[in-house]
Amino acid sequence: AALLCGKNLLLAGEKATGKNVLAENLATVFGHPAWDISFHVNMDASSLIGTDTFRNGKVEFRPGPVYSCACSGGFGIFDEINMARNEALAVLHSALDFRRVIDVPGYERITLADDTRFIATMNYNYAGTRELNEALASRFVVIRMPALTLEDLQRLLREQFPDLSSKYNKQFGLLFMDIQKKCESGELTSKAMDLRGLLD
């Protein structure tokens, strides 16, 4: 409903809870092209909006993924948005609020195509992440992704490994949940295992 009303989404939760899969599926359901943008600590405004480049003997603007998405009416998927520094993200404020514009320094101000939406994902308590500032977070409708239950995990294991006996399915499920509890209590590092590692 939020996307239909022109809002942007922030999918937040533990790692491997399907945030990116949901974001990509939403773009598919709405029938819009998707731009996957992986955020990192060295990201700056030009890597999002675009930068000058030298081509055929002259300086030209090379659009970044946010600029291209905004012009095309696509869905921009901001993967792990809380990996980037808040200073780099400030350039997104006017695109994400009621103004729906992007200022391109030295060029023009563009208005986002009507269908343009942004879906950000973020992990909590993950190495290298930081808190989003309130100014940015307030521009999203936040959806907290539910943690994986034992029943969900066993269903996934059945789908991925149909030849696995129910006995081993349950044992793998219980082992994974035990490791997860130990990670949460600090007895094990969170690098010990995640859902992707289990299914691989």
Named regions from a protein language model:
Residues 188-200:
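C-terminal alpha-helical "lid" subdomain
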Residues 1-178, 184:
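AAA+ P-loop NTPase catalytic core and its hallmark functional loops
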